[in-house]
Amino acid sequence: INGFGRIGRIVFRAAQKRSDIEIVAINDLLDAEYMAYMLKYDSTHGRFDGTVEVKDGHLVVNGKKIRVTAERDPANLKWDEVGVDVVAEATGIFLTDETARKHITAGAKKVVLTGPSKDNTPMFVRGANFDAYAGQDIVSNASCTTNCLAPLAKVINDNFGIVEGLMTTVHATTATQKTVDGPSHKDWRGGRGAAQNIIPSSTGAAKAVGKVLPELNGKLTGMAFRVPTPNVSVVDLTVRLEKAASYEEIKKAIKAASEGAMKGVLGYTEDDVVSTDFNGEVCTSVFDAKAGIALNDNFVKLV
């Protein structure tokens, strides 16, 4: 793992629940003792379920020794010394093929970017275009919003056809925001206090769906509202359909996908849920059947 921030630590926690992933090395400019502390305690996801300690400069988790380094340049990471197959590039800095390729130079076989690429590095989203993966050594897993939107958009487009659509994401606070008003030169609104405001913001998530689902290219765009919640975001997708369908028919199509081809990726619920009910959710997208609404058989809002 390169970058042990919010995403890096959540990747680590998720990997601990799987038998087919072994974390062998972490690179971050933090010292090992502080990394152990940040892994152990998490305000959003609670205490780490297991043992965490530091021995001889290594992180030891559940008795397993993990190499810790503090290199600024990924080219110096010597991943081959610890047998790294895949690097989770979670710094948010190295989001191009040219910069991420330094991990390959350092001995890694593959790199997964944990955010949208800044160049033409291919993006892959579960439930959308995983079948298009052709062995590329550097890929992007896009953004959290794209992972929520793409599976839903695919089901709707495959079953009813999307003429055009607008997306709004009601988005939890992220690390780039300010606790109180502060300078944010590129995005003035983004510098306003995160806990006090609903902040309109831009998002490339809807356009990114056009990259992972080319048939929707140019048909979707969207914006975001940053809201004062610590985790879990909502996608509100409003679309015009080619093929007329009642809201009940749309629900049926999504439910069928959630139990079939998209099981484990796209969830479906008819419960009276709220955002905190999805803290730690394993599906990347969960359709809230009760929250959506149709104006008519060709115009519908999905949540």
Curated annotation (Swiss-Prot):
GO MF terms held by the record: glyceraldehyde-3-phosphate dehydrogenase (NAD+) (phosphorylating) activity; NAD binding; NADP binding
Listed InterPro entries: GlycerAld/Erythrose_P_DH, GlycerAld_3-P_DH_AS, GlycerAld_3-P_DH_cat, GlycerAld_3-P_DH_NAD(P)-bd, Glyceraldehyde-3-P_DH_1, NAD(P)-bd_dom_sf
EC nos: 1.2.1.12
Pathway: Carbohydrate degradation; glycolysis; pyruvate from D-glyceraldehyde 3-phosphate: step 1/5
Positions of the record's site feature: Activates thiol group during catalysis: H171
GO biological process: glucose metabolic process; glycolytic process
SUPFAM superfamilies: Glyceraldehyde-3-phosphate dehydrogenase-like, C-terminal domain, NAD(P)-binding Rossmann-fold domains
Major localisation: cytoplasm
Subcellular location as annotated: Cytoplasm
CDD domains reported in the protein's UniProt record: GAPDH_I_C (cd18126), GAPDH_I_N (cd05214)
UniProt key word Nucleotide-binding: yes
Entry keywords, A to Z: Cytoplasm, Glycolysis, NAD, Nucleotide-binding, Oxidoreductase
Catalytic machinery residues: C144 (nucleophile)
Residues involved in NAD(+) binding: R6, I7, D28, R72, T114
GO cellular component term of the entry, any: cytoplasm
Binding residues annotated for D-glyceraldehyde 3-phosphate, in chain numbering: S143, C144, T145, T174, T203, G204, R226
Catalytic activity field: D-glyceraldehyde 3-phosphate + phosphate + NAD(+) = (2R)-3-phospho-glyceroyl phosphate + NADH + H(+)
Oligomeric form and interacting partners: Homotetramer.
PANTHER family hit by this protein: GLYCERALDEHYDE 3-PHOSPHATE DEHYDROGENASE, GLYCERALDEHYDE-3-PHOSPHATE DEHYDROGENASE-RELATED
Family: Belongs to the glyceraldehyde-3-phosphate dehydrogenase family.
Function recorded in the entry: Catalyzes the oxidative phosphorylation of glyceraldehyde 3-phosphate (G3P) to 1,3-bisphosphoglycerate (BPG) using the cofactor NAD. The first reaction step involves the formation of a hemiacetal intermediate between G3P and a cysteine residue, and this hemiacetal intermediate is then oxidized to a thioester, with concomitant reduction of NAD to NADH. The reduced NADH is then exchanged with the second NAD, and the thioester is attacked by a nucleophilic inorganic phosphate to produce BPG.
Protein name in UniProt: Glyceraldehyde-3-phosphate dehydrogenase
